[in-house]
Amino acid sequence: MAYRDQSLGELAIAIPRATKLFRELNLDFCCGGKQTLSRAAGKKDLNIDELEAQLEKLAAQPSDARDWREAPLADIIAYIIPRFHDRHREQLPELILMAKKVERVHHDKADCPHGLANQLTAIYNELSQHMMKEERILFPMIGQGMGANAAAPISVMEHEHDDAGRDVEVVKELTNGVVPPEGACNTWRALYSGINEFITDLMEHIHLENNLLFPRALRGE
């Protein structure tokens, strides 16, 4: 099957395991989910034939992941809040504490991620406000069947998702692609492992909203 003309968002929905592959290849399937596979691969100088072959293999594998394309929107919202919103509220305070410790203890090392704690704090504050607006305003509208009238708040949320994506890129720059240096202490390694987990969760979170929940809500489903 030819995947090159399909969008990253469509492929991430149709082939759940594709999100892991896209993350490994640094292909933005959440905020940049509307670009085609061919265009995204071209930007990264990836071999489109090899990429399609990898997706073919993933699509052929059985998956126990839920197919959200036909699920009631209320079910999607009920999944997003505990799986992503509550999880981010747990992840970020701990990551901020570890980042402060690493910056304090290793401030004299060349690879020290100076400014990381402040950047994570900014992400936490912005994301907390963002999720609160979704939970108090947008999600209730969608749950009450008013999604077709929610174009304005959805547009705001999508712009804030773009902002979050740019904030994550700053984190990657500060952390050498979130790769700990050789000889890094356990806290440093745990910090970067936790950041990678957070980024993976955030991308899945934004993908589910941008590419599935919001479009379906706007169609009045």
UniProtKB/Swiss-Prot annotation:
Pfam families: Hemerythrin, ScdA_N. InterPro entries: FeS-repair_YftE, Hemerythrin-like, RIC_family. GO terms for biological process: protein repair; response to nitrosative stress; response to oxidative stress. One of its GO terms (molecular function) is metal ion binding. Keywords: Cytoplasm, Iron, Metal-binding, Stress response. One of its GO terms (cellular component) is cytoplasm. The keyword Cytoplasm applies. Homodimer. Di-iron-containing protein involved in the repair of iron-sulfur clusters damaged by oxidative and nitrosative stress conditions. This is Iron-sulfur cluster repair protein YtfE. It comes from Pectobacterium atrosepticum (strain SCRI 1043 / ATCC BAA-672) (Erwinia carotovora subsp. atroseptica). The lineage of its organism: Bacteria, Pseudomonadati, Pseudomonadota, Gammaproteobacteria, Enterobacterales.
